[in-house]
Amino acid sequence: MNRPLSAEAEEELEWQVASRRRKAWAKCRSSWQASETEDLSTETTTQDEDEDDEEDLPGTKLPAPAGRGNVPNEKIAIWLKDCRTPLGASLDEQSSGTPKGVLVRNGGSFEDDLSLGAEANHLHEPDAQVENCNNILAKERRLQFHQKGRSMNSTGSGKSSGTVSSVSELLELYEEDPEEILYNLGFGRDEPDIASKIPSRFFNSSSFARGIDIKVFLSAQMQRMEVENPNYALTSRFRQIEVLTTVANAFSSLYSQVSGTPLQRIGSMSSVTSTKEVADSPPPLTRSNTANRLMKTLSKLNLCVDKTEKGEGGSSPATEKGRTLSISLSEDGGGGKSDPKLQKVVKKKESSSMLATVTEEVSGSSSTVTDSVDADRLSEEADSTISHQEESEESREAHSQEKDPLRKSAVTDPDLGHDGRVSSHCELESSSELKSAQASSSEKEPCAPLTIPSIRNIMTQQKDSFEMEEVQSTEGEAPHVPATCQLSLAKSKRDHLLRTASQHSDSSGFAEDSTDCVSLNHLLVNESLQAMGSSADSCDSETTVTSLGEDHVTPTAQDQPYFNESEEESLAPLQKGRAKVEIVAEKRKADNQDFPQCVTAENAGNNESTKGPCEPGHQITETGEHPPLAATGELPREESVESDVEKGSECEFAQYTTHHILRSLASFEAQGSGMSSEKKTGFPSSVDRVNTALQRAQMKVCSMSGQRVGRSLIKSKDLLKQRYLLAKAGYPLRRSQSLPTTLLSPVRVVSSVNVRLSPGKETRCSPPSFTYKYTPEEEQDLEKQGTEHDGQSLVKSTIFIPPPSVKKEEAPQSEGTRLEECHHGRLAPCPQFAPISQSTCSLHSVHSEWQDRPLCEHMRTLSAHSVPNISGAACSAFSPFGCPYSHRHAAHPYRACSVNPPSAIEMQLRRVLHDIRSSLQNLSQYPMTRGPDLAAAPYSTQNSSVLPLYENTFQELQVVRRSLNLFRTQMMDLELAMLRQQTVVYPHMTEEDRYEVDQLQGLRNSVRMELQDLEMQLEERLLGLDEQLRAVRVPSPFRPSALPGMCGSRSVDNLSCPSPLNVMEPVTELIREQSYLKSELGLGLGDMAYEIPPGESSESVFSQATSESSSVCSSPSHTNRRSRGLPGSKPRARLVARKKIFRASVALTPTAPSRTGSVQTPPDLESSEEAGGAEEASPVVGLASHVEEEPEDLSLMPAAEEMHRNVEQDELQQVIREIKESIVGEIRREIVSGLLAAVSSSKAPGPKQDSH
């Protein structure tokens, strides 16, 4: 539009246009109606009046839709309000706030509200014009707006009435023209060139994105068409077709052999195989020869026949392979062998036999020329061997296998295998010798026994083929053999066949042990292994398969990177493995029943589960050469395993390095069922296996190979030293993992933990050693041997890490593993006898009634030392601490430093200390009642009221305990942080600052020292109470009389009163328990035949975080389970009531990062170890694990207990003295180090290291 030069003209034109547009919009909305003409009695300029009249005169006005009532126009008002200020609003409008307020309150028509945008479509005024209008008319419009806006809330139809009839009027009166707003919002303007919306970078440079190049695509299509031309054979283009062709040819060849009618082979394999295939293909067999043919073919397929021997001489390898495949498939169908398994086996065998081609094709189609050659040889060999009697073939096999460098190198069976074959040539053994991939395949496929003998022959023939990878003995195959045969074979195999070295491919599923066929566990394990191993086998075979020219040496672990650590271990250089195997073979001869136990590195974790405990084939452990593989903590074990493996019972517990909490005992028991069956069959005793595991663990520290043969127990000191070294090496606290769930059921797993407790410092927990209890007979043997080799071993208290109920485990066992244990299920709780339950270490002196109650769960969470009966006499020691802020220990004058207001953290720490002291004081109030009361409570109804108190007190104490732990941790962390910061700044500090620093340091030291002092005093009290408790307990274990004090509100507190901080307490309890057990065992209780089998040390250190929660106490149910675990002596299991079961659950709270010099030296370990010779006795720095200690079942003999107590006292006193001395020395060191740390920066890193 042409703009008039004058402002007024400009405005006039603008408003005319605006009014016309609004009218047009109203009409299109069908909302224009006649309205009364109104005088614009406003103070607006005549121009505005004219404009208004023009709008009104047409007699049509936007009515306020009366029917709708006064619809509030707040939405539009808000929209206008939001838009107007920044968009060219005039100074006038900005200064006026009233219009805005009016606006918001005004109502308008619903149509206006909905159709504001329609008007925007007609706006084409340039911005500049609108802005000019706004500047000029702002005042006038505002006047109108004020006048009419006051009555706007009633949307009258006439302007004369002073009301605004429509939104358009309102907008017109508003100081800012809505057109301007809409323009600014982007309405009604010409769209800019769309190119302007595209960033220039897209035009400046071409895109690098790759699309479809039509030319390339077309050329590819043309090439594909050419390749797929039938003239080139489909196999050259599609691998699938190639495989299908091979299979079809195999079937056709099989059919031709069976039917005697030659068939045209599908697709000339010319592209892959030589033309002489046809010539080589054997003439169709007559029906009379069909059976022979099938046998030979199967043997070829299953046991890659030596490629050197070409029985068929020229049959194209593809045909041979196809034939073998077809035969195996047919047999599978008929013989009940699973076709897929056979195929897998055949593939593996072929790949192994045709070493030249390691590629998948070899295994899948086996159509490579080299394969064909090998196949020919194999077929010929198979034919020749098949013709011979199976047994003779087997014998040959044994000899040939011995000859075979592969087998020999494959440490697996050559030596052992030979013996095994000799003893039980039974088809299985010879086939087991075939350990080659075929063996694994045969294992996978439940081959008919018939296949196995032929396979043996073939294997013997396979001198040239490199099947080291599969060097697994046919033990794995045994499951395919009839159960009876399997049993006999298993025994012989156990004695002779050990797949010690060639375990590398065991993971491929060879883990299936024929020896274990007796036990379902093995079968299950085998199945799982097969599932796992199917892929593993293929990988293993391929990796192990090397050119035919290669030495027949099992590739080292390096050769087979794919293998799990366990596999790698088994792959240890064959030479080494061979030598070991030979040694093992000899040992095994001595221990015919023992089978090497497989140690699987954590890497093989998946295999671990699948391998199952009974997988003699996995003698990977034997390869001590790969300790690094087991570096996870298996190192000692694996090394020791070499000899142990041989000795290990056939059911090897796959020893897992995995750091999990022991699985529930139930899992062991489940395994035990299989184990018991094995025992029945004369399999090596589970005890042997346990011993083997234990020896393995200790191999590193003490080379007791000779003792191992005797299954001697390892000395606790040696173990402790070893563990200490391991811990020092930086092993983090780990969770112990239970043996595979499929372990022999008779097993009772008891774990002993060497705990090295440095007061106020990081505790170190040696990986707990686990003892597995099997049938009593076995235990007796172990006991005898153990006593001969190491008297202490018997004494070591075994820690039973049961899967306490899930509730309990919550914190300590939050880790899934423990929960798994729980899931495995717990045997029904068995009532504990008061004396047993009352043992100071066991809060569980709970009556069986309580066991099912939630309280019981809570009780379990109580620390093992939770029920120290602290005598009143000891109370005096704590009297000073009863006062929250009583003077620091007299020895520490640092209190004076507190002149400065303590920091918030220090205050918090003091509060925590106050809580601790109060709890201790509370305990001291009920010196003697606690122990007896607890024991009595379950038996007396009057004590029923104690339960709620007990729960409440327990919870409170737990809170205090956590706060204490938190306090210690925070304090240590705080100190470390402060020292680090101060050391940097200290040289630059002023004297005053340094003085403050020294004061704070002194304060912290005093706090720490006070805590240690409290622990020391608690220790003394506990010892005194323990004696008193025993005196009370022994005479009447069930004595129901409950002291009335027990009913007192706080009497129950005493149960958990012992300071959770007290690190020494658990140690002393362990020692006490050890000595007690020792005395009991020494007093002719050996006849009970319950010996503590050597624990298998699985590095399990419970993470400190987990440990923070209270330790889990074993409940009576554990005892019951334990007793049941003994397979051979179920009656004895029932006798639990007559046997004394000591349960100590030790809650070692995580200690805060220790300060400088926190790590205690091994000497302390030894001293603690000596006490009771218990492995637990050796504290390991940083132990925060919750270990549940469960000594062996012992008969309840009060008299004997008294005697033991006397014997025990001396040892306890000695140990206590040593501990005190070490603590005192440590405290001194800490004081000095603390002082130095504040001054010398060099010491700053020290504490950090100690904490780790």
From Swiss-Prot:
GO terms for cellular component: cytosol; nucleoplasm; plasma membrane. Residues 357-372, 429-441, 1103-1117 have a biased composition (Low complexity). One of its GO terms (molecular function) is signaling receptor binding. Residues 1151-1161 have a biased composition (Polar residues). The modification Phosphothreonine is found at T85, T1149, T1161. It is found in: Cytoplasm. It holds the Pfam family KRAP_IP3R_bind. Keywords: Coiled coil, Cytoplasm, Isopeptide bond, Phosphoprotein, Ubl conjugation. Residues 955-1031 form a coiled coil. The modification Phosphoserine is found at residues 90, 109, 207, 268, 328, 465, 643, 667, 736, 738, 745, 758, 766, 866, 898, 1036, 1051, 1056, 1059, 1114, 1154. InterPro entries: ITPR-bd, SSFA2_C, TESPA1-like. This is Protein ITPRID2. It comes from Mus musculus (Mouse). The lineage of its organism: Eukaryota, Metazoa, Chordata, Craniata, Vertebrata.
